[in-house]
UniProtKB/Swiss-Prot annotation:
One Pfam family of this chain: COX15-CtaA
Official protein name in the record: Heme A synthase
Entry similarity comment: Belongs to the COX15/CtaA family. Type 1 subfamily.
Catalysed conversion reaction: Fe(II)-heme o + 2 A + H2O = Fe(II)-heme a + 2 AH2
Entry GO MF terms: metal ion binding; oxidoreductase activity, acting on NAD(P)H, heme protein as acceptor
GO biological process: heme A biosynthetic process
Assembly notes: Interacts with CtaB.
Pathway of action: Porphyrin-containing compound metabolism; heme A biosynthesis; heme A from heme O: step 1/1
Membrane topology, from the record: Multi-pass membrane protein
């Protein structure tokens, strides 16, 4: 496969991650209106004023603009080169473009017209899908060489494993939404203790922001347990399937790091590094789970072809 295409895929994935983390930084620092209610200009100018909020918001917009050019280039090039090897390339190319523009549109509308926490939480979720689409498209580009050399072992995914993969992909997105809602309702520090909310009221939440925070923690705990169960199933039954076993090892690592960074967000009183790491690890986890969905689609197609 063309080395330049691989390089473009890696660069585009990195820039999409920068956009995702940049959006989290905008929320963390309250810089959403750093350029006022104007888009794409910043207080009527192309270059921002020299203050932190304006620079953070403008940099996020700049990265988003660069990502549009890169994603369009990658999608078209991958569609031309990789589709003959992997039929799912077309779908991923379209997905990456649609969700990228949807993400940009929501961000622009939020700046110009304002928005509420529910919609802004959705903005992060759409950004996550956009990133995952580009990540998987890049993985396909690298896998195309292995496929040509027939190094990819035929997939075997049972119904139980498919249930874990599909169910966790959907449920993780829900947990992501609750986490984004925590940030946009300013509930990140509503509960100063872990695992209970506080030392008052028997550790139970007593007002809206505490309920939002504890709801997210409960959902995240269930996510951790579910991934642990799926990982154990993979270890028992899929040792010969490196893509699946390796994926679950990565998923478990990401969810552990996600939990630890979430705890440190509370104890560090939302230190920027831990807050951004929290977004980074969930992006990695969601990317792995979306790759599992690709494997399921590929397995079902191959099974159908064998039965014809």
């Amino acid at each position: 496969m063309n080395k330049a295409l691989k390089a473009l895929g890696v660069l585009t994935t990195f820039v999409m991650l920068v956009v995702l983390i940049g959006g989290a930084l905008v929320t963390k620092t309250g810089s959403g209106l750093g350029c006022g209610r104007q888009w794409p200009l910043c207080h009527g100018r192309f270059f921002p004023e020299l203050n932190a909020a304006s620079i953070i918001e403008w940099s996020h917009r700049l990265a988003s603009g660069v990502s549009i050019v890169l994603v369009l280039s990658l999608a078209f090039w991958a569609w031309r080169k990789v589709t003959p090897v992997f039929r799912e390339t077309t779908f991923l190319a379209i997905m990456s473009i649609i969700f990228l523009f949807l993400q940009a549109l929501l961000g622009a509308l939020a700046v110009v017209f304002g928005s509420n926490a529910l919609v802004m939480a959705l903005h992060f979720g759409i950004s996550l899908i956009s990133f995952a689409s580009v990540l998987i498209l890049t993985l396909l580009i690298f896998e195309a060489d292995k496929s040509d050399k027939k190094l990819v072992k035929p997939l075997r995914i049972g119904r139980k494993m498919q249930f874990h993969m599909i169910g966790l992909s959907i449920y993780t997105y829900i947990v992501v939404y609750t986490g984004a809602y925590v940030r946009h309702t300013k509930s990140s520090l509503a509960c100063p203790d872990v695992p209970l909310c506080s030392r008052l009221n028997h550790g139970l939440p007593s007002h809206f922001q505490e309920w939002v925070q504890m709801g997210h923690r409960t959902a995240a705990l269930l996510l951790f347990v579910w991934i642990l169960v799926a990982f154990a199933h993979a270890v028992r039954s899929y040792k010969d399937q490196k893509q699946i076993l390796g994926g679950w090892i990565a998923a478990l690592a990401f969810v552990v790091l996600q939990a630890l960074s979430g705890i440190m967000v509370v104890y560090s009183e939302m230190a920027t590094g831990f807050a951004l790491a929290h977004s980074l690890f969930i992006a990695g986890l969601f990317g792995v789970l979306c790759y599992f969905l690709l494997l399921i689609a590929r397995f079902r197609y191959e099974s159908k072809q064998r039965n014809i």
